[in-house]
């Protein structure tokens, strides 16, 4: 659906060159909700603005539905952009226009006739839960309602792709969740491909099917959300994951545990139906080890259960080896944190 090949953006001034993004390549499947996460200044917003050529790339290609946007003329690009919607962190609504007229604006620019515009706006208002706000002005709306107007406006021209640049960063947690649920519903209902730019791993956890981690202008890691959460390869991905699944033990506890003979500290991760398995009870019974729970959490990656357990296992070397074999047979990821 979307292929980004070796995309680079360099800002040049008289004194220096600043590399905003460098040699970025991504394949984004049709119908995916693709998260691009990074710290402030990593280059993620530049990347999303290059995708629809609000920023002109210095090099590389952006291919959507087989068409290279970087090779298009101004007229061709204007037509292509009608199939790419975008929503922003700070909404960018026209304060002098009503909700109805804000949603209608891109249709007016695209040259749609008045009856077509009216029909489309009336179709979008209930979709975003604003059917009773058509003639209200932005100043009378909450932050969440303003973003719903932004979403409806972005959907007005029936796009195939929706770009979301920090779309929930200005919202409170409850409103954030309602906006994410709306985007998830739109994705499932219309098969829309959504690209989510964010610095919050909880957004990725809640809604994304795939994720790319961008760090210092380059892609540090990418893949299906489940794979990245369970087996992160980069230090920056591990740091982001720890913000939603904190699993580091206090140093004083680790020092105390280090005095326990014949013990091992392990972290176990499980996904899906494994979350309801009696892992610890079976482990103690089958392997004759003692298992002390030090930390545990369980949550969802989209609709899939994901959990971690940090255990102190006590037993002789043979029992500990048998415990690892038992866990491996159940396809659980096991990481040894500390041997004693």
UniProtKB/Swiss-Prot annotation:
Belongs to the ABC transporter superfamily. Methionine importer (TC 3.A.1.24) family. The complex is composed of two ATP-binding proteins (MetN), two transmembrane proteins (MetI) and a solute-binding protein (MetQ). Its main location: membrane. InterPro entries: AAA+_ATPase, ABC_transporter-like_ATP-bd, ABC_transporter-like_CS, ACT-like_dom_sf, MetN_ABC, MetN_ABC_transporter-like, NIL_domain, P-loop_NTPase. Gene3D superfamilies: 3.30.70.260, P-loop containing nucleotide triphosphate hydrolases. Residues 2-241 form the ABC transporter domain. This is Methionine import ATP-binding protein MetN. Keywords: Amino-acid transport, ATP-binding, Cell membrane, Membrane, Nucleotide-binding, Translocase, Transport. Part of the ABC transporter complex MetNIQ involved in methionine import. Responsible for energy coupling to the transport system. ATP binds at residues 38-45. The keyword Nucleotide-binding applies. It comes from Desulfitobacterium hafniense (strain Y51). GO terms for molecular function: ABC-type D-methionine transporter activity; ATP binding; ATP hydrolysis activity.
């Amino acid at each position: 659906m979307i292929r980004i090949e070796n995309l680079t953006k360099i800002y040049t001034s008289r004194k220096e060159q600043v590399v905003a993004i460098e040699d970025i390549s991504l394949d984004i499947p049709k119908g995916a909700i693709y998260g691009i996460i990074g710290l402030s200044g990593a280059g993620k917003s530049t990347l999303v603005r290059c995708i629809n050529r609000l920023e002109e790339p210095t090099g590389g290609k952006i291919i959507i539905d087989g068409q290279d946007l970087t090779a298009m003329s101004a007229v061709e690009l204007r037509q292509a952009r009608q199939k790419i919607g975008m929503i922003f962190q700070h909404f960018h609504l026209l304060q002098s226009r009503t909700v109805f007229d804000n949603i209608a604006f891109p249709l007016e620019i695209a040259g749609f006739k008045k009856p077509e515009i009216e029909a489309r706006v009336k179709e979008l208002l209930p979709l975003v839960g604003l059917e009773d706000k058509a003639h209200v002005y932005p100043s009378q709306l909450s932050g969440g309602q303003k973003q719903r107007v932004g979403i409806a406006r972005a959907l007005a021209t029936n796009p195939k792709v929706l770009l979301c640049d920090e779309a929930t960063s200005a919202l409170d947690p409850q409103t954030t969740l309602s906006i994410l649920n709306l985007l998830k519903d739109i994705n499932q209902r219309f098969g829309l491909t959504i690209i989510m730019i964010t610095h919050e791993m909880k957004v990725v956890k809640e809604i994304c099917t795939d994720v790319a981690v961008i760090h210092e202008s380059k892609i540090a890691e990418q893949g299906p959300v489940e794979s990245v959460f369970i087996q992160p390869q980069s230090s920056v991905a591990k740091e982001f994951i720890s913000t939603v699944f904190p699993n580091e033990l206090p140093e004083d506890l680790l020092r105390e545990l280090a005095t326990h003979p014949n013990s091992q500290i392990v972290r176990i991760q499980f996904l899906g139906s494994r979350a309801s398995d009696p892992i610890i009870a079976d482990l103690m019974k089958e392997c004759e080890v003692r298992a002390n729970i030090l930390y545990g959490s369980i949550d969802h990656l989209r609709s899939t259960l994901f959990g971690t357990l940090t255990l102190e296992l006590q037993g002789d070397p043979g029992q500990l080896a048998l415990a690892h074999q038992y866990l491996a047979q159940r396809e659980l990821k096991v990481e040894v944190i500390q041997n004693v």
